[in-house]
């Protein structure tokens, strides 16, 4: 699995229909109208997310490995 930065994952989430509802410090909060979950993505410059956090976010958002470009 390719790791990505928080910035890039935010772009992928928006492309999948998630919208940013607010930013608290360096954490971007996303929601989707047909879902009850919220996703918090840390954006710390261009550093990659740790693999466990990235997998958890991808699982909630139904993002496949092929969607990471």
Identify what each model region corresponds to.
Residues 1-24:
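N-terminal first-folded block
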Residues 35-39:
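Short, charged/polar, Gly/Pro-enriched secondary-structure boundary elements
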Residues 27-28, 44:
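Histidine-centered active-site/metal-ligand motif
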Residues 45-69:
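C-terminal structural segments of small proteins and small subunits
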Residues 30-34:
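Active-site beta-strand termini and strand-to-loop segments that position acidic
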Residues 8, 27, 54:
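Gly/Ser/Thr-rich beta-alpha loop segments that engage phosphate groups in nucleotides
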């Amino acid at each position: 699995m390719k790791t990505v930065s928080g910035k890039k994952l935010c772009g992928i989430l928006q492309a999948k229909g998630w919208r940013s509802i607010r930013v608290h410090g360096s954490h971007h909060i996303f929601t989707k109208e047909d879902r009850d979950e919220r996703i918090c993505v840390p954006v710390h410059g261009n550093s990659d997310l740790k693999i466990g956090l990235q997998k958890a976010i991808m699982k909630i958002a139904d993002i496949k490995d092929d969607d990471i470009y």
